[in-house]
């Protein structure tokens, strides 16, 4: 074990004194966090609060249902300001002039469900247009359900003895039922602005976690390249000639990568807390557990990669294109919620996505329950990659 620690410490000292490596893994993520957190604040922070939605409204359908949607849904929502518009051309002009955020047209026969509401908005108002579109579609779906429920109830009531004996007036009952259900339909639709967790994540928080997850990935190639460099300079061959077992030497190489990843993690954590004022959540112990397990995973993958490649060009290619691809898929470049469904599914196959989700959960007020899956996953990845990598390198 002492020999493994000695080998690990040797690698750590080499990487600390490497100015290029220090800039890449320590300073660069901090610089990018500062730039992205400030420049793209509207992309992330914009999702944590919805400003008042200015809606232009054209109502071609003059049915009671369409009137109820305007009166009991749109006009009762505090965050929506409704303006009646005379024509579609006027609506388009108001959208272009930024006087309204969203335009909605209720066409003829909307009540019957034969046509859908048409929602128009500027390209930068997709969230607000989605809210209005969802409100309209939810309302009409609830109205249909109410109508079917009322129809079914009346069919049942009309067959009862009370109606047959004249003790119950079906028309009066139907009127009361309709009013009650209509009121419920309008009252059910509200907009609640709420974070997924107990706290909302700011842009600096998001990109602090995102940059940390991305730059810790570089240890995959840094560890593999360190192994290849020592192989090319025959340093590894000289170490293998010593009485130390091969597995001890190889474990020491993994430990060196792991220790440097830990150093990077804690430096980044301390600087973002004290300089940028980033809140990583109420429990830094859980943040550390997640960071340490993620570091173990990327260090294990570095040994597996070292066992699969034999030249520096391949390592450089993976370090360039491969790591950037993982960073994009894992949400380090753009927030995950902006991904289409297909990429959302694909991103779950990369480790940095799990790490980012874990850090964000802690920032939102989550606890150990949110970390169990990623921590166990990273432990499994790190252990399996280390064992397979050492066995492959041992035979080589």
UniProtKB/Swiss-Prot annotation:
GO molecular function: ABC-type transporter activity
Entry's localization field: Cell membrane
GO cellular component: plasma membrane
Induction of expression: Induced in response to linearmycins and other polyenes via the two-component regulatory system LnrJ/LnrK.
Keywords of this entry: Cell membrane, Membrane, Transmembrane, Transmembrane helix, Transport
Keyword Hydrolase assigned: no
Membrane topology according to the record: Multi-pass membrane protein
Domain (ABC transmembrane type-2) ranges: 161-396
Pfam family name, one: ABC2_membrane_3
InterPro entries on file: ABC-2_transporter_component, ABC2_TM, ABC2_TM_bact-type
PROSITE patterns, sorted: ABC_TM2 (PS51012)
Domain of life: Bacteria
Transmembrane segments: 21-41, 204-224, 258-278, 284-304, 317-337, 370-390
Its job: Required for resistance to linearmycins, a family of antibiotic-specialized metabolites produced by some streptomycetes. Part of the ABC transporter complex LnrLMN that probably facilitates linearmycin removal from the membrane. Responsible for the translocation of the substrate across the membrane. Also mediates KinC-dependent biofilm morphology.
Family: Belongs to the ABC-2 integral membrane protein family.
Subunit structure: The complex is composed of two ATP-binding proteins (LnrL) and two transmembrane proteins (LnrM and LnrN).
PANTHER family hit by this protein: LINEARMYCIN RESISTANCE PERMEASE PROTEIN LNRM, MEMBRANE COMPONENT OF ABC TRANSPORTER YHHJ-RELATED
Name of the protein in its database record: Linearmycin resistance permease protein LnrM
Naturally occurring in which organism (per UniProt): Bacillus subtilis (strain 168)
Gene that produces this protein: lnrM
């Amino acid at each position: 074990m002492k020999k493994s620690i000695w080998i690990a410490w040797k690698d750590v000292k080499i990487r600390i004194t490497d100015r290029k490596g220090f800039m890449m893994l320590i300073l660069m993520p901090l610089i990018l966090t500062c730039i992205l957190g400030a420049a793209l604040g509207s992309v992330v922070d914009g999702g944590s609060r919805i400003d008042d939605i200015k809606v232009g409204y054209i109502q071609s359908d003059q049915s009671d249902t369409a009137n109820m949607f305007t009166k009991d849904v749109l006009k009762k929502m505090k965050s929506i300001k409704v303006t009646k518009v005379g024509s579609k051309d006027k609506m388009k002009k108001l959208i272009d002039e930024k006087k309204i955020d969203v335009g909605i047209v209720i066409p003829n026969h909307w009540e019957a469900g034969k046509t859908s509401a048409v929602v128009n908005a500027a390209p930068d108002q997709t969230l607000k247009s989605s809210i209005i579109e969802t409100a309209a579609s939810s309302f009409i779906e609830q109205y249909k359900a109410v109508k079917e429920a009322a129809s079914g109830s009346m069919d049942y009531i009309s067959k009862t003895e009370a109606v047959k004996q004249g003790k119950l007036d079906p028309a009066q009952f139907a009127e009361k039922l309709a009013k009650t259900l209509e009121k419920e339909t309008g009252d059910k639709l509200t907009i609640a602005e709420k974070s997924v967790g107990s706290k909302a994540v700011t842009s600096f928080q998001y990109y602090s976690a995102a940059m940390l997850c991305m730059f810790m990935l570089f240890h995959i190639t840094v560890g593999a390249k360190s192994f290849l460099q020592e192989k090319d300079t025959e340093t590894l061959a000289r170490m293998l000639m010593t009485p130390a077992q091969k597995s001890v030497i190889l474990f020491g190489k993994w430990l060196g990568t792991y220790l440097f990843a830990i150093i990077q993690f804690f430096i980044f954590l301390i600087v973002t807390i004290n300089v940028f004022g980033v809140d990583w959540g109420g429990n830094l112990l859980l943040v550390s557990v997640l960071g340490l397990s993620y570091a173990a995973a990327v260090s294990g993958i570095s040994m597996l990669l070292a066992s699969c490649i034999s030249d520096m060009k391949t390592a450089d290619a993976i370090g360039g294109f491969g790591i950037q691809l993982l960073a994009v898929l894992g949400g380090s470049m753009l927030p995950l919620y902006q991904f289409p469904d297909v990429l959302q599914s694909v991103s779950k196959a990369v480790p940095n996505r799990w790490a980012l989700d874990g850090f964000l959960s802690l920032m939102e007020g989550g606890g150990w329950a949110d970390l169990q899956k990623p921590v166990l996953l990273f432990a499994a990845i790190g252990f399996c990659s280390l064992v397979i990598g050492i066995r492959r390198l041992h035979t080589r």
